[in-house]
Amino acid sequence: MSRQDVRQEIQRLIEEYQLVGELLTNLQAQHATVSELLEELTTALDGVRLLKGGAGERLVHIGAGLFVKGVFETKEVLTPLGAGYHAFLDLDNAERVLQERIEEYSRLKTSLEENIGKLAERAEQIRQVLERLGIR
């Protein structure tokens, strides 16, 4: 391998290392977003299950740390269906929709975690090679 070939290979490794780092950053941001959505969906599912539990006084979070106390006798909730559409669904169907979304986002989160792991492993391999070559 000529010096020129070695330089080109080193440059390619450096570029790959930078690209892998950018991809890792993007995947980690997506992972954080999916984790937040899962938390929100789980909270909503808990709320629907509480409503299914029967009448009684409840505290409902209305944002910014504020809660309102009330008695809810509703049998339906306005549920997002996707693509900006909402529908009033009975509590059982709302629970089913939320559970399906939780499963979908859980699979996505697992996939992101696997990809993050693979990219982190590749980044470490490249870093070790560059380190052995005295670069970085």
Curated annotation (Swiss-Prot):
UniProt-listed GO biological process terms: protein folding
UniProt KW Cell inner membrane keyword: no
Molecular function terms, GO-annotated: unfolded protein binding
GO cellular component assignments: cytoplasm; prefoldin complex
Keywords: Chaperone, Cytoplasm
Main location: cytoplasm
Record's keyword annotation contains Cytoplasm: yes
Compartments, record wording: Cytoplasm
Alphabetized InterPro entries for the sequence: PFD_alpha_archaea (IPR011599), Prefoldin (IPR009053), Prefoldin_subunit_alpha (IPR004127)
Disulfide bonds: none
Signal peptide: none
Domain of life the protein comes from: Archaea
Subunit structure, interactors included: Heterohexamer of two alpha and four beta subunits.
Function: Molecular chaperone capable of stabilizing a range of proteins. Seems to fulfill an ATP-independent, HSP70-like function in archaeal de novo protein folding.
Family listed: Belongs to the prefoldin subunit alpha family.
Name of the protein: Prefoldin subunit alpha
Species name: Pyrobaculum arsenaticum (strain DSM 13514 / JCM 11321 / PZ6)
